[in-house]
Regions:
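Positively charged n-region of N-terminal signal peptides that target proteins for export
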Residues: 1-5
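Bacterial N-terminal signal peptides
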Residues: 7-17
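Bacterial Sec-dependent N-terminal signal peptides
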Residues: 15-54
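Residues that mark the start of a beta-strand
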Residues: 57-61, 88
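Short hydrophobic segments within beta-strands
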Residues: 61-63, 92, 181
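Conserved SGNH/GDSL esterase-like catalytic core that processes O-acyl groups on lipids
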Residues: 70-158
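Alpha-helical cap/lid subdomain in secreted, periplasmic
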Residues: 128-256, 268
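Conserved catalytic region of serine esterases and O-acyltransferases that act on ester linkages
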Residues: 250-253, 257-318
């Protein structure tokens, strides 16, 4: 009887330990666009202590369109889940806007940007703002740009607007590091009218994007590249790929695995080098989209994002 009681006690203790170690945080969306993550910070491999991170800060401003929103939708939640503090992530976006249009709005300085800021794990709208309002709202470490998707593989559409935007941004903050989100190719069956720029061929579009970004790096000196497009293309070769090829409409990213993988890529590129903690082991999940982020899907997205970023930067911290 005594041995039996000891056995029951051991079972009970094991059960309590397993309950305390699960630490899975799941995003339960109010709808497919707005998400309300919980506040669990458990389960992240190598989570830094408050003493490790309280002296470090990072401020990221993303300028773009709906592809920008796809890229960073889950980034604040991933950062919070990792137990990382003192990170400000902001986005100033206009749907379907190209570098040419951003340059025009920067010159006119009209109140057309949908501006949102996250300091605690979720974006909060600041309403319509001018280009200058957004830039002057904080002292940004990184300002991330991108081209509109249909022109992302056509470098001739980047200039002179990209160089002009860089000069304008540096007139506000000379020390800001300019970065670039490499966007993704459309699905093979995409109906986007801009797909004709690439003969309605995903491979041609993908390779054109790679070529354009390489030319941009050479001509502008931009070295901080967020290789979202490579990560999405790699995932399309795995068993989680679907008819829409990780998009929700042939071009915007799926609300589940697509957006999650993109945010993992941003995390590995910008967050890891500063805070010395990677995405691998992050317990954030997303029960949305055509490819929900289960434990298996999350691990795959994390591993591919980590590997792609390491390979892109030659296994060095960017």
């Amino acid at each position: 009887m005594k041995i039996f009681k000891i056995f029951l006690l051991c079972l009970f203790l094991c059960f309590m330990q397993s309950c305390g170690e699960s630490g899975i945080e799941t995003i339960i969306p109010e709808n497919e666009q707005e998400n309300n993550p919980s506040d669990s910070h458990e389960g992240q491999n190598g989570t830094p202590s408050d003493d490790d991170t309280k002296s470090k800060t990072l401020k990221i401003l993303a300028i773009g369109n709906s592809f920008t929103e796809d890229g960073i939708a889950y980034l604040p939640s991933l950062v919070r889940n990792a137990g990382i503090k003192n990170v400000t992530i902001a986005k100033m976006v206009i749907g379907g806007t190209s570098l040419l249009s951003h340059h025009t709005h920067a010159i006119k300085d009209d109140s057309v940007y949908n501006f949102s800021i996250s300091k605690d794990g979720s974006f909060k709208s600041q309403g319509k703002k001018k280009f200058s309002d957004c830039l002057l709202s904080d002292t940004w470490d990184y300002v991330i740009l991108q081209q509109v998707s249909q022109h992302s593989g056509l470098y001739r559409t980047y200039q002179p607007y990209l160089n002009n935007l860089i000069n304008i941004i540096h007139s506000y903050y000379p020390q800001a590091i300019i970065g670039w989100q490499m966007t993704w190719a459309y699905s093979s069956t995409s109906s986007h009218t801009g797909f004709k720029n690439y003969d309605n061929n995903q491979t041609i579009m993908y390779e054109s994007i790679l070529d354009a970004v390489n030319q941009m790096k050479t001509e502008t000196g931009i070295t901080v590249i967020i290789p979202t497009g490579i990560v999405i293309q790699e995932l399309r070769g795995t068993n989680i790929n679907n008819y829409f090829e990780l998009t929700r409409d042939g071009y915007h990213l799926d609300y589940g695995a697509g957006r999650y993988a993109a945010a993992c890529t941003w995390f590995e590129t910008l967050i890891r080098p500063i805070f010395q903690i990677g995405i691998k082991g992050n317990t954030l999940r997303a029960n949305s989209g055509n490819v929900p982020v289960t434990d298996e899907v999350a691990l795959l997205c994390q591993e591919i994002a980590e590997n792609v970023v390491k390979k892109y930067y030659g296994n060095k911290e960017n």
